[in-house]
Amino acid sequence: GSRGLGDVYKRQILFEGTDLLHCERSFLRELQGNDISVVFQEPMTSLNPVYRIGWQVEEPLRIHHPELSAQERKQRALTLLKQVELEDPERIYQSYPHQISGGQRQRVMIAAAMICEPKLLIADEPTTALDVTVQAQIVKLLKRINQKKGTAILFISHDLSLVRRLCSRVIVMKDGRIVEQGAMEDIFENPQQEYTQKLIAAIPRCVKKNSGRSAKTEEAHG
């Protein structure tokens, strides 16, 4: 491109047949937080430190469902906090972000993202700021949401072991371009592109074994 950004290609972001790059802003506002929700990688910076958790979880309802009463919003928020497996939802509801752990904050973000029952949940590196044990718990939670609610999940991650546990289809990107795409098993067991092969080869052997065992275990208990 003329500004040194490389070649410029025609781009589209299609959602149910509509190009989101060329639609009315009012249409986008209706989608955001309602049909499409996002969970970011650092919940502490995504949550407002001066508002209680309950108020923030309810925010999408105030925007997209103003017909609901305060009591109805609270009840739905408490239900979601319970569904994301937070103990003592009432206490979490009344808490401020700094009063709960990083893993709990990320579960809160997932609850807020799911409160309007979106068709698509974009999870942008949602486990990066968490320790390994909590990472695994969040991935299992996302998988259950996908299976029980039918919500499509776009999971963005550099951690291939987590990708393998959660995803059914994988798109490998390098420098903003698609290198390879296909079913999860095909990508991990028979990668075609050299870049993908190097990524797979870089996964520690113990992680590969554990990921495979976890996938089989989840399938057996699913």
What are these regions (language model features)?
Residues 1-9:
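Single conserved hydrophobic/aromatic residue that forms the stacking wall/gate
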Residues 19, 72-91, 200-201:
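Conserved ABC ATPase "signature" region
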Residues 115-119:
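A short, proline-enriched helix->beta-strand linker immediately N-terminal to the Walker B motif
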Residues 136-149, 161:
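Helical segment within the ABC ATPase nucleotide-binding domain
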Residues 163-165:
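A short, surface-exposed alpha-helical micro-motif characterized by mixed small hydrophobic
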Residues 181-182:
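ABC ATPase "signature
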